[in-house]
C-alpha cells in the first residue's frame, strides 16, 4: 500500500511524523496520531482514529511506528480519491450548484441517462432525504452512495 506513495509524500509524512515523535524512538503514541493526520490535511473522526489505531497497533503497546503510519496514510489517501469522485458526482446532479439535489435535478439527470422514472425519482429522494426538506444535501448523497 505504501509503495503507491510518491517520494515527496513520504518525506512530507516523515516530517510530520518526526514532529510528534518527541523522544526520537521512531514511534508516536496513538493519541498523537490524530494531530499528525490533521496536520497533513486529513480530518478523521474519533471513531475513525480508533479504527485506524486498532488496525495498525498490532502489539497493543499504544504506539505506531513509521512503516505502520505510512500504510495508514496510503490507505487514507486512497479513500480521499473516492471522496473527490463523490463530490464530482454530486456536482453533476446539482445543476444549479446550490448544494442540494432537487427532485427536478435528479429527474433531469436520470432522463438524460435514458431512465424514465417518475415515481422512482420521488422514492429515491424520500429514501435519501434524511432531514426531510425534499432535497438531497451532500451528506445525504454520500450516505446513499456509500451504502451501495
From Swiss-Prot:
* Pfam families linked: EF-hand_7
| Gene Ontology CC: one annotated term | myosin II complex
Which residues does the annotation say bind Ca(2+) 2? 57, 59, 61, 63, 68
Keyword Heme attached: no
Residues that hold Ca(2+) 3 according to the record: 94, 96, 98, 105
Instruction: Provide the binding site for Ca(2+) 4.
Output: 129, 131, 133, 135, 140
Annotated Ca(2+) 1 binding sites: 21, 23, 25, 27, 32
InterPro entries this protein is in? CALM/Myosin/TropC-like (IPR050230), EF-hand-dom_pair (IPR011992), EF_Hand_1_Ca_BS (IPR018247), EF_hand_dom (IPR002048)
Instruction: Answer yes or no on keyword Phosphoprotein.
Output: no
EF-hand domain: residues covered = 8-43, 44-79, 81-116, 116-148
* Record keywords, A-Z: Acetylation, Calcium, Metal-binding, Methylation, Repeat
Further notes on this entry?
This protein has four functional calcium-binding sites.
Q: So what family is this one in? A: Belongs to the calmodulin family.
Question: In its UniProt entry, what is this protein called?
Answer: Calmodulin
The species is Fagus sylvatica (Beechnut)
Q: Which gene encodes it?
A: CAMF1
Amino acid at each position: 500500500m505504501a509503495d503507491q506513495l510518491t517520494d515527496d509524500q513520504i518525506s512530507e509524512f516523515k516530517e510530520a511524523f518526526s514532529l510528534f515523535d518527541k523522544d526520537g524512538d521512531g514511534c508516536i503514541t496513538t493519541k498523537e496520531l490524530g494531530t499528525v493526520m490533521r496536520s497533513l490535511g486529513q480530518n478523521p473522526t474519533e471513531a475513525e482514529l480508533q479504527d485506524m489505531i486498532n488496525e495498525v497497533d498490532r502489539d497493543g503497546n499504544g504506539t505506531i511506528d513509521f512503516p505502520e503510519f505510512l500504510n495508514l496514510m496510503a490507505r487514507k489517501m486512497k479513500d480521499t480519491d473516492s471522496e473527490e469522485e463523490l463530490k464530482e458526482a454530486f456536482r453533476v446532479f446539482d445543476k444549479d450548484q446550490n448544494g442540494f439535489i432537487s427532485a427536478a435535478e435528479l429527474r433531469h439527470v436520470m432522463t438524460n441517462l435514458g431512465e424514465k422514472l417518475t415515481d422512482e425519482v420521488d422514492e429515491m429522494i424520500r429514501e435519501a432525504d434524511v432531514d426531510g426538506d425534499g432535497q438531497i444535501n451532500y451528506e445525504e448523497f454520500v450516505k446513499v452512495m456509500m451504502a451501495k
